[in-house]
Amino acid sequence: MANNQELNIIHLYPDLLNLYGDRGNIACMQKRLEWRGIDAKVSTCTNSDHSINLENADIIFVGGGSDREQEIVCSLLLKKKDEITNYVENGGVLVAVCGGYQLLGKYYQTANSKIEGLGILDIYTDAGDTRLIGNVVLESELFSQKIC
């Protein structure tokens, strides 16, 4: 490797949150880093091994799952809420896609229940009549350009 850099990625619950092939997002990150001469070391936190060490984490990745799996993961993450919140508030990078982002909000409402989120983001999600799938473009006063 050209410059001996390493990036530590923690993939949270890939065994439960992989509804739309989110392992592919990790593979894509690894490849794009490789092209830049950066090794990506991926650690996982799974339903059978709940250990998370954020001390050396450069990126935390959370994918999406069905309501059932997201509810399981949310209950597990709530036990680590302070640790994850401190990580983010101290400049840690957390990438959440699909339903994974709803876990970061105050709550998300499913067809049957209201699930408490981590409250890291000041958002909430209400289930609609139809499932929305596709790309999102955001604009915010915090950023000078659109976020895709």
PLM-predicted stretches and their roles:
Residues 4-7, 142-147:
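Beta-strand-turn-beta hairpins that frame and shape the catalytic cleft
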Residues 20-21, 27, 132-136, 148:
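A broadly tuned "polar low-complexity/structure-edge" signature
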Residues 1-86:
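N-terminal beta1-alpha1 cap of cysteine-dependent amidohydrolase-like domains
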Residues 67-144:
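Cysteine-nucleophile active-site neighborhood
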